[in-house]
Design a protein with these regions (language model features):
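N-terminal beta-alpha supersecondary unit
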Residues: 2-85, 114
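Short beta-strand scaffold segments in enzyme catalytic cores
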Residues: 13-19, 136-138, 144-148
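Short Gly/Thr/Asp-enriched flexible loops that form oxyanion-binding sites at enzyme active sites
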Residues: 81-105, 300-308
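Conserved phosphate-binding/catalytic loops in two-lobed NTP-binding clefts
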Residues: 111-112, 290, 307-332
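Conserved phosphate-binding catalytic cores of ATP/NTP-utilizing and phosphoryl-transfer enzymes
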Residues: 112-135
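Glycine-rich phosphate-binding/hydrolytic loop that grips phosphoryl groups
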Residues: 118-120, 320-358
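Glycine-rich phosphate-binding loop plus the immediately following alpha-helix
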Residues: 151-196, 240-241, 245-251
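A contiguous, well-structured pocket-lining segment that forms one wall/lid of small-molecule binding clefts
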Residues: 189-196, 209-210, 214-290, 300-313, ...
Length: 359
């Protein structure tokens, strides 16, 4: 089966062509047109600008994906498109384009949930697929949640953030300490410098950082976003607000502070919160596989820490490659395949939705 997938939920216009056979998925092409440079001028995504950019890019991106895959539309057996959640104007561009393409060429159409797509990015690696039931977490600029994946199309939310997403908090604090939007990669590097400075070692385990004098420095205290109420939930707004107040105090008092050590402390609290809740989730649900996906899954400190948690719990960890952690269409095609074989085809009346309807 040859699959054409389209993604336009936020600030990347993406198209991909996948093939699926008895050996699994093959990504024949994956094209992403990023709007980062445009939105960087505003410090974040401007929805109207994003929608207009999608309109300008979607046809060319799809054509390039088909050309690189060396296929024509007559070779395509299935069209998949992100239909929710996301920016409504951005989603509508992809949905309407995919609907027109599918209808004009009499190809079945499947609507895909963006978060299910992120988790499906883990199905595109070389390792065996995680077998349901398994535990998955989606960590991005808009989502922070744990899911019990009962089948490749049936998900149950078992933990979530009650306010801000982990990626949004990194972007906000990153901007305040001079890291350009999106802050993820820059924050990762700066925190790495801070961890090395605090421990005297490159890529030191976070357990070593916790023993350092830098961690014991009370002037850099930040609270954990892991809620201590027996749930698998988070509150990243508390961590973010505490960090903002700390930065304001430094500024008002004319105090110098080490940006790298600050980034390390913030990263430590965010990563350890995810690790703590992952440990709790794995003890609560008897699974053999764990998937970590979404843009924040590219964070090197988080990847290493969750690998430690998975190893200790005796479960297999599946993390998409770095190129598939961010928004892309290949992941949408992978999830779309499973929706299709489950009989979840979309009608011509398909509409986009900004709301998250993963369950």
């Amino acid at each position: 089966m040859n699959i054409l997938a389209i993604e336009s939920s936020c600030d990347e216009t993406a198209a991909a062509v996948l093939a699926h056979d008895e050996d699994g998925f093959s990504v024949l092409s994956s094209i992403v047109a990023s709007q980062i440079e445009t939105h960087r001028l505003y410090g974040g995504v401007v929805p109207e600008i994003a929608s207009r950019a999608h309109i300008e890019a979607v046809n060319a991106v799809t054509y390039e994906a088909m050309e690189r895959a060396a296929l024509s539309l007559s070779d395509i057996d299935l069209v998949c498109v992100t239909a929710q959640p996301g920016l409504i104007g951005a989603l509508l561009v992809g949905v309407n384009f995919a609907k027109s393409l599918a209808a004009a060429n009499k190809i079945p159409l499947v609507a895909v949930d963006h978060i299910k797509g992120h988790i499906a990015a883990a199905y595109l690696g070389e390792s065996p697929l995680p077998e349901p039931p398994f535990l998955a977490m989606a960590l991005s600029g808009g989502h922070t949640a744990f899911y019990l994946v009962k089948s490749y199309t049936e998900f149950e939310i078992v933990g979530t953030t009650r306010d801000d997403a982990i990626g949004e908090s990194f972007d906000k604090i990153g901007r305040l300490i001079g890291i350009p939007y999106p802050a993820g990669a820059g924050f990762d590097r700066l925190a790495g410098e801070g961890f090395a400075k605090a421990t005297g070692r490159e890529n030191a385990p976070l357990s070593l950082y916790k023993k350092s004098e830098a961690y014991k420095d009370k002037t850099m205290y930040l609270p954990s976003p892991a809620l201590a109420d027996g749930s698998l939930d988070f509150s990243f707004s508390g961590l973010k607000t505490a960090a903002i107040n700390l930065l304001h105090r430094f500024e008002q008092n004319g105090e110098d502070f080490d940006r790298a050590l600050f980034a390390a402390r913030y990263t430590y609290e965010a990563v350890e919160a995810v690790a703590k809740k992952t440990e709790e989730a794995l003890s609560r649900y008897q699974v053999t596989s764990l998937v970590m996906a979404g843009g924040v899954a590219a964070n090197s400190h988080l990847r290493r820490r969750i690998a430690e948690v998975a190893k200790k719990a005796g479960v297999t960890l599946h993390i998409p490659s770095l190129s598939l952690c961010g928004d892309n269409a290949a992941m949408i095609g992978a999830q779309g395949y499973y929706e299709y074989i489950a009989g979840h085809t979309a009608a011509s009346s398909l509409n986009a939705s900004a709301a998250d309807s993963i369950v």
